[in-house]
Amino acid sequence: MKVIAVTGYKPFELGIFKNDHPGVECIKKALRRKLTAFVEDGLEWVIISGQLGVELWAAEVVFEIQVEYPDLKLAVFTPFLEQEEGWKEDNREYYEFILSQADHVDSITKRKYESPEQFKLKNQFFIEKSDALLAVYDEEKPGSPKYIVEAAKKKGEIENYHSYFILFSDLQDIIEEEQWNNAE
């Protein structure tokens, strides 16, 4: 596996409204574990669409991993131009920082937002251009990642395409592990 697409929930879907929420570090730790293992097995590129939440947290994790594995690259392929246009200023600044550190940035449709079709095109692009999908996703709470997860599963039925998931139970295990370590 050379290229993995990473996605997951938007912050509000997780009840997270600030990047210093303790849940963010838990999610980043889970992403770090998975991505580091994939890098050790030959992963070269992580691709995201730049949406707030799991995708931008994954970008931060990639930057951390690059210290030890400088050959790992991050690409941000936005579904449309200026997707951050309606965001709050602090979210725009955070997003622009991520873009400034990414190894490659491009827009899939190369147009500003026109219709939901652009999100469908984004999902198709990500599944076509990657060897696997890593999603912070639980079928009990479908949310925004539902459509790309369905597309990945469909591709996996006909081709050698893998979907990897970080479930809520995985995040709970990390929380309990942290509590156990802090109690010692």
From Swiss-Prot:
What cystine pairs are annotated? none
Q: Where is the signal peptide?
A: none
| Annotated Pfam families | YpsA (PF06908)
Concerning NCBIfam families, the annotation shows: PRK13660.1
The family assignment reads: Belongs to the UPF0398 family.
Protein name in UniProt: UPF0398 protein BALH_1408
- Native organism is Bacillus thuringiensis (strain Al Hakam)
